[in-house]
């Protein structure tokens, strides 16, 4: 249910494929949701170039233009709603929010036949069968459980010849935890009461 998962699901649905979009959170958007607030940047901001003439096309552009028109203030909760509407408007998509994939079943060494999910909100277990599966989870749970090769952290630029990729040690291997807070000027002192 992140941006890449939404785009994959909507594209498949528009091509006539019956699609199930599984999202482990209560909102869509992944890192771009109101829970994290890493805005959809794509080509417009890669390695700090902030190229105002760069622009994503396709579904990303459709989402960004719709958001710009309907959400002029950039409210992250409105983006959540817009993304939910985008998915719900596709009759070929079944959406499973608050559902975490935890295992896979394979019909052969190289082919997944089923994934298993659990919705913590209504205690429902899901068995989802299909011919194609897209792992856009961010942590690669489907690929990992299927036995695919994987790496943790960022690869160095020479691995794939990516000019904008970081050099060794340029940033840490894994993302840390984050704490989000708001602050505002109330125009007067505010008493802080620490939690008990």
What are these regions (language model features)?
Residues 142-196:
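Rossmann-like dinucleotide-binding core of oxidoreductases
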Residues 69-73, 127, 168:
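Active-site rim elements
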Residues 131-132, 136-141, 146:
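Glycine-/small-residue-rich beta->alpha transition segments that form the dinucleotide
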Residues 5:
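N-terminal Rossmann-fold NAD(P) dinucleotide-binding loop
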Residues 11, 17-18, 23-110, 151, ...:
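Conserved N-terminal/central alpha/beta ligand/cofactor-binding core
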Residues 114-119:
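Short beta-strand segments that buttress and anchor functional surface loops
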Residues 122-132:
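Core beta-strand elements of the Rossmann-like FAD/NAD(P) dinucleotide-binding domain
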